[in-house]
UniProtKB/Swiss-Prot annotation:
Protein name: Large ribosomal subunit protein bL34
Keywords, in A-Z order: Ribonucleoprotein, Ribosomal protein
A GO CC term assigned to this protein in UniProt: ribonucleoprotein complex
Keyword Ribosomal protein tagged: yes
Organism: Nitrosomonas eutropha (strain DSM 101675 / C91 / Nm57)
Region (Disordered): 1-27
Classification of source organism: Bacteria, Pseudomonadati, Pseudomonadota, Betaproteobacteria, Nitrosomonadales
Length: 44
């Protein structure tokens, strides 16, 4: 049986990357929240 997680850098960046986050209002809210919390890594 094939496992559900088939890692790929491209698809990961396209969905969870910084620029992908900045495209939407909700994504910008995520970045803002992570900045406020003091996260070292804002996105993948």
């Amino acid at each position: 049986m094939k496992r559900t997680y088939q890692p790929s850098v491209i698809s990961k960046k396209r969905t969870h990357g910084f620029r992908a986050r900045m495209k939407t209002r909700g994504g910008r809210a995520v970045i803002r929240a992570r900045r406020a919390k003091g996260r070292v890594r804002l996105s993948v």
